[in-house]
Amino acid sequence: MDIQQGGNDLISLAATIRTELQQKLSSKARIHLPFDEDRTEFDKANLRFTQYERPTYLAIVDPVCEDDVIEAVKYARGKGIPFTPRGGHHSVTTTMGRFQNGICINMRPLNQMRWYAEKRHVTIGGGAITDEFVRFVHDLGMEVTFGAGLGRLQGKYGFLNDNMVSCKLVLADGSTVIASKDSHPDLFWALRGAGHNFGIALEATFQVYPQAHGGIHHTWDLEYTLDQCDEVFRTLNSVYESMPAELAIFILWLRQSSGRKHIILVNLVWSGPAAGADPYVQRFESLQPVLNSGRKSVPWPELPFSTYKEINKLFCNPEIWLRGPYKMMGAACVERFDLKTTREFFESVKSLSEEWEDRGWFSAMFECLPDQRVREISDDATAFPWRAGSNHFLMLNATPKRMEDRKVFEDHLNYWKRRFIETSGYGRLQQYVSYGNGTSTMKDPPEALYGYEPWRLEKLRNLKQKYDPDNVFRWYQPLLEP
């Protein structure tokens, strides 16, 4: 039953939640309900990158301090009401669709940041988003890997979670712990790769590093036709064999660009002195792109909004999200790009883009990131399972305008996900957890998200039993099925 369609029992329950929970929160904390006369704040917090297989909320809590989060957790547990935190509203994971008519704890107000110069540590609140964090760190003259845990600087610094120093967490019973290498080290291990199964992060502290080259990064966008696909990916495979820590490469499919249709865009980012990029840029320029942006040199915080034709300005704009509300994703990881599979995939995207031009969109983004520091760290150092097996991350995207057409779009994603797995070089799905379960019609097993080694899954499950025996945190990419 959907409260937004008028279920009387749910309306009554939502009103009760506000009455009872508001008394336990600080005076400036707010609770928003879907039937409020002025729905502005509820609608703002309810907005989401995709409406496909989305969760629904009886109430959305805006905390103003950590105690508000703790009280909301204790209240929900005591009443047997499901609850979930949320931050940047960007999840595409369909497992969240199981969460219906619960309490949403909007973490965005807890976006405070602190700097400890002596140790070069930055502490960020659980509601901070990427742009806020990156600008704060950049203004300090520092940097670290950032992205979805992965990032362009991982060849230098490892993953973002490799640089976590500690995390303050609300557990399922409402208690708080600080996990670090010296305090609850078992939980600290689990947080770095599977943390959403164990609690709500109130804040986390990270090691950061002095900026190289004044925090300036250099970027090139080069566009190719579908006829050039084999040459592009043959070159990419070759470059990756000796890819330096300063280089990161993204590949995108664009339905149209600069008056041309069906374009493969190669974005190169170089984090060292500009001249060092020349041998790699020249490899791609020698393929005769139909458009070459030339070099752009930008500060680190502007990089996401300067690369691949500034598309992130759309992805990060909530006002744009509802223009294509039903975003779906299929993802996989490959050791090398199989030329035949990759070309046939783009041919399929072109064909479907033409056939369904007025009824939806098809696209893709491939991430090819350096791994020097990533692989220097022991494979068992954190819960992240793919330190030695995660060369290229593939995100296949499809967005129908109407859910009546969903099957065509889901089938496309599922088919090509299977094809890429078959030719991945790994012989199985090795899935970055934030990219998993992008359609509701093809399930990623826990092993694909958390690792196939028996010891790794056993350790995680034992820790789950220790810290969340009732499987309260079971909505986002659950380690254990609800």
Curated annotation (Swiss-Prot):
Pfam families: BBE, FAD_binding_4. Its EC number is 1.-.-.-. Pathway: Secondary metabolite biosynthesis. Its cofactor is FAD. Residues 53-211 form the FAD-binding PCMH-type domain. One of its GO terms (molecular function) is oxidoreductase activity. The keyword Chaperone does not apply. Keywords: FAD, Flavoprotein, Oxidoreductase. It comes from the Eukaryota. InterPro entries: BBE (IPR012951), FAD-bd_PCMH (IPR016166), FAD-bd_PCMH-like_sf (IPR036318), FAD-bd_PCMH_sub2 (IPR016169), FAD-linked_Oxase-like_C (IPR016164), FAD-linked_Oxidoreductase (IPR050416), Oxid_FAD_bind_N (IPR006094). The keyword Oxidoreductase applies. FAD-linked oxidoreductase; part of the gene cluster that mediates the biosynthesis of alternapyrone derivatives. Alternapyrone is a decaketide with octa-methylation from methionine on every C2 unit except the third unit. All the domains in the polyketide synthase alt5 are apparently involved in alternapyrone synthesis, that is, the 8 CMeT, 7 KR, 7 DH, and 4 ER reactions in the 9 KS-mediated condensation steps required for alternapyrone synthesis. Belongs to the oxygen-dependent FAD-linked oxidoreductase family. This is FAD-linked oxidoreductase alt4. It comes from Alternaria solani. The lineage of its organism: Eukaryota, Fungi, Dikarya, Ascomycota, Pezizomycotina. The gene is alt4.
